[in-house]
Each structure stands twice: as C-alpha cells, then as structure tokens.
Amino acid sequence: MLVSKLSTAAKAIMMSALAGALSMAVTGCGTTASADRTANWSPNRIYAEAKDEAGSGAYDKAIPLYEKLEGRAAGTPLAQQAQLNKAFAQYKGGDQAQAISTLDRFIKLHPASPALDYAYYLKGLVNFNDNLGLFSFISRQDLSERDQKAAKESFEAFRDLVSRFPESRYSPDARLRMAYIVNSLAQSEVNVARYYYSRGAYIAAINRAQTAIADYRDVPALEEATYLLLKSYEALNMVTLRDDTRRIMEKTYPKSAYTTGGFKSVDKPWYKFW
C-alpha cells in the first residue's frame, strides 16, 4: 500500500515537472517569436527604416515603426515628424479615418509646431481625395457628384491653413483647392436642379438653382444655375421672370455657351488648371 502511494506521488511529481518544462519551452519560443527587432535600434535608425518601408509602398510596415518612434523619441521634433509621417502613410494606405484622427491629435498636442501648417494641409488633402481622388478618370465622376461631407471638411482644413498661415508654402495650393471645392458644392446643387428640370419638376429645379445662387458667389456653376432658372421659367410660361432672368444672363454671361448650346456636358468639368 505504501509503495503504491509513493508510486502515485512520484507520478504526480513527474507530470508536474513535465508540464512546467513544457510551459517554459512554449513561453521561451513565444518570447523569441515576438521579440522586438527594434529593441536596440536608435530613433534615427527606426526613422530611416520607416521611411524606406513607406517609400517602397509598404505602409502597413511603416506605420508601426512610426508608432514605435513616437514612443522612443517622445518630446522631440523627431517624434512630431514620425506622427506626421504616420498620418501620411495611413492616408496613402487607404485609411483616411485613421489619418484624420492622427492629424487631429497632432494639431491638438502641438499647437506651436513649425509643421502645423503641413498638418492642416494634409488634413485637407486627405478629405479632398477621399475615396476617388481629385478626379476619377475611370468613372468620370467629379467632386460635385460625390458626398459633400468630406468636401466641406476639406474646405475647413484648407481655410484654417490659409487664415493662420497665409505665407505658408502650402497656402497657394490650398487656395486653388478651396476654389474648386466651393464650385463643386455649388455644382452639386445645380446637378440636383438639372435632374429636377429633366424630370419636368420645374418648381423644384427653380428652388435648387436659387439655393446655389443665394449660397455661393463668383463661381462657374452659377452660370448653369441661372440658365436653369431661365429654362424653368420658360417651361412654366412665367414670362416676366423668364425675361428678367434672360436679361441677367445676357448681362452677367454675355458669351455664355448655354444660350446657344444648351446644358454643358458633365464629362467636361470646368476645372482645368490642376
């Protein structure tokens, strides 16, 4: 009986020892597998490696390196640069939401940064190019035909840039993009007005065209909005309003192609100087 008890106890000890050894082996393997290869790297080396990865298009590899650098070089200009580079990598990698989040954090944490103008510019650019880019040459879809939320947020970021940093090297490009955005917002209203007009909903077309004219100033889309008013009043036989609008059209747009050629093709956007 005693021998049996000792034998049972010995087996239990052996099993426990084997389990412990196995656990240590597994833990050791896991530690080796998950070892941080950058543990002994200098911040400058991490930065160089991250730039190389981003330069080759491996944004998924560059982003975690920039994140490590933010921690390793915290409180230094290099950490700020890493944060901006990470935002750019997120943007180029197709994660616009994360890029905006990173930039918002940068703007909040570093209000005195010499790179703050770039942060605003990049934030505007991310929203400007959201989903389809400046132009979609494949689908021929321009900004006025897309969701306007991103366009408005892009405009706000560019506006912050040019108002706070009018002499920034990024401001001239931002102003051009702002002009395009404003026209695209007006053109979006005109697109709806044109849709209503094509369906014979002339009152609705008038309302949307008037909204574009009331809300926006000095943008190319207003020429088409005015022409839509003219044609809608004509269709409704509202002679006085039609004639008044024709006089406005002739005075404001004396060489308008609309009066001779009708509605312009949406395949030929006005914006040519990009």
Language-model regions, residue ranges each:
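Bacterial N-terminal signal peptides that target proteins for export
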Residues: 2-17
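Bacterial N-terminal signal peptides
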Residues: 15-25
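Acidic, polar-rich low-complexity tracts and alpha-helical solenoid repeat scaffolds
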Residues: 2-6, 25-274
